[in-house]
Amino acid sequence: MFKNYLKIAWKVLLRHKLFTFISLFGISFTLLILVIITSFIDHTVGRETPETRQNRILSVTYFRLSTPKGGNFVGPLVSYYFLDKYVRSLEIPERVTIGNFHKNIITYKDQKKFNFALKYTDGEFWNIYDFKFIEGKGYSTTDVNLVNPVAVITADVRKKYFDDRTALGEYIKLGKKDFRVIGVVDNVSLLRILPYSDVWVPIT
C-alpha cells in the first residue's frame, strides 16, 4: 500500500517538473538557512574555547556615570585607572580582567606586510578565559606591573610571521616596539569578540 502511494507521488512530481523543482529548492534552501543560523548562534553564544565559562562571566562594555547635579555620561571611554581602582576592588566578582576591544595594527618583516588584530589586557585575562596553549603561557600581573614587553600570539601569526617555526623567545615588532613572544595559542574566532585577537600584550 505504502509502495503504491510512493509510486503515485513520484508520477505526480514528474508530471510537473518545474513546480517540483521550485518546491524542493525552496524547502532545501529554507532548511539550509535555518541550519546556518542555528550553527552561527551556537558558535557565538555556546561554550567553546576560550569562552568555556560563559555562565560565570559578566562582561561590561559600557558605563553610565551620574553626577550629583544630574549630569550623565554613557560610553566605553573609562580610564584604566578608574577601572583598576574602583572596579577591580569590588568584593562580589571572584576575578576581574580589564582589556580593550582589538584594533588592527600593521607591521613589517623582511619587506613583508602583516595586518594583525592587537589587544591589550591585564594578567587576569589568562585566568578567566580558557585558551589552549600550543607553546608557552600567558603573561602575569607582574609582567603588566613591570611593563614587560611580552606578547602572546596565535598559531596563525606564528605561521605567517615566523614561518611556522617555534616562536618562544622570538621578537615581534608592533608599531615601533619589539615584544618577546612567551606564548602561542590556538586561533580564536572573530565571533568571540571579547577574547578575540591575533596578538595580546600587557595593558599599560
What are these regions, as identified by a protein language model?
Residues Y62-P76, E94-E124, G138-A151, S189, ...:
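Short acidic/polar micro-motifs at solvent-exposed secondary-structure junctions
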Residues M1-Y5, V74:
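Juxtamembrane loop-helix boundary motifs flanking transmembrane segments in multi-pass membrane proteins
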Residues Y5-L14, F82-Y86:
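A short amphipathic helical element positioned immediately N-terminal to and/or at the very start
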Residues E124-G138, P149-T204:
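Mid-to-C-terminal secondary-structure elements
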Residues H16-T44:
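Short, strongly hydrophobic transmembrane alpha-helices
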Residues L13-H16, S23, T44, V60-Y62, ...:
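Generic structural signal for small/hydrophobic residues in well-ordered secondary structure
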